[in-house]
Amino acid sequence: MSDPSKDTIRAHWKCFVACGIIVLSPFQYGLDFGLIGGLQAMPGFLKIYGYRAPETAIGWNISTTRQQLISSLMTLGAFISSSLAGFAAAKLGRRMCLWIACLLCAVANIIMMTTTHIVPLYIGRLLIGLANGYFMTFSQLYIQETSPAKYRGLFLSIFQFCTSFGTLIGTIIDWATAKRPDRSAYLIPLAIIYVVPAFLFVAMIFIPESPRWLILQGRYDDGLKSLKWLRPKNADVDKELNEIRDAINKEQETASGVGILDMFNNPVDRRRTLLSIGAVLLQAASGSMFIIAYKAYFFAMAKVDDPFAMSNVLSMAGLIAIIANSFIVVRYGRRRVLLINGLVISGCFQLIIAVTYDKNPGSHVTGRVLVALSCLYMMAYNGMIASYSWLVAGEMPSQRLRSYTFGVAAAIGFLGAWLITFTAPYFINPSSLNWGPRYGYIWFPSCIVSAIWVFFFLPEVKGRTLEEIDAMFNKKLPARHFRTHKLEGEAGGEAQGKSSVEVEVHEAEKV
């Protein structure tokens, strides 16, 4: 059996450092959401890009079209860059694509800070979306491909924590500057966007490229060096390299090259691609994006006292859920958490929010109730849906097609986010339908349908190595059999005598 002393966090400290640097990417993504969502409720910003509206709670408003484009162009840019991620990853690698994202982020921010015209602002939002698409896609790929199976779930929980923590920091910065009467109200938050990409750009110089990507390129010596850097001192990295190489070679036996259409030509790869796409879309299906993107504006128009402070409370609630989830992940399967505790609860809270506002709209008491319910909803979403959807989506693709599959899945996930952020202003803006919190009526059935999909189609791969997951998909197991299936003499090895990339498979609890 493997030496437990080689499989501790302390033994893997260099891998934790590398992944700790990379998770600054989702922090940047969350920071952008937190900052931009609050700008649209700042008088200092609305004096430039909005119009005076005495009938609204803050005395200012922004047109539905501008509101749509400012928020949704970022997700549109993320959709575009994620769609093309497979092509970039095939030649450039994970780190190089993240370096490109840092540069795009800096250029976009220069444009947004120096203009007072709407069109350059749109261009800046699109460019920063391109950067965010790379940040989210390639940081996930790097973590999936470098972390040992035992800690993959932990790293992805940290990934989601950093996204939420970034959002919280963004909302706190907005709250601190919101009452400034001039352009500094939003220029200070925008200036903060430079910090993370600058640090990330320099820090990535000191960590290795993904070993799986290097091996996929045939650069075995470089892959071995990367594994030696990432793994404990006495780990059997030669064995791990051979396992990765054998798994890749086995997949490539049926194809002479790799292209985007390969995701759908083979029934096994088609299944894995659709599962990855479906897992990412769970976030959009929960309806969370309109609250995340417009929470300060949403609270302001619902006449909530101090909407920026309440946005901080909402972000903090989501962050607490992520921390609590890190203790849950060890005990419960992802499928159960996603199904029972995530989608169903989130859908019910969306329905309760809508009904509560429908019965007594516009009162301060209703506003306080909405904040409390929104916090509970965000805890359910962050702790149970967001924590697992990206994780599962990254585990589903085959190693040969991982860049293409996850890139397309991320792109469609961003497309879903774009659709919500683009259409939400029609529903919540007083100058349009003015539904406000009634928007929750749409998301209750969406959550229930998503929960049904998870129950019937999404397999449980908790504790499995990427090579073991490949073997189970190749055997065409039904989703319900993944949890209890025992692998003997297949990719990934047996349950005993695991290498450094393998992990004990916990005894599966019954559904």
Identify the role of each PLM range.
Residues 1-232, 249-511:
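Alpha-helical transmembrane bundle of multi-pass membrane proteins
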Residues 237-252:
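Short, well-structured alpha-helical segments
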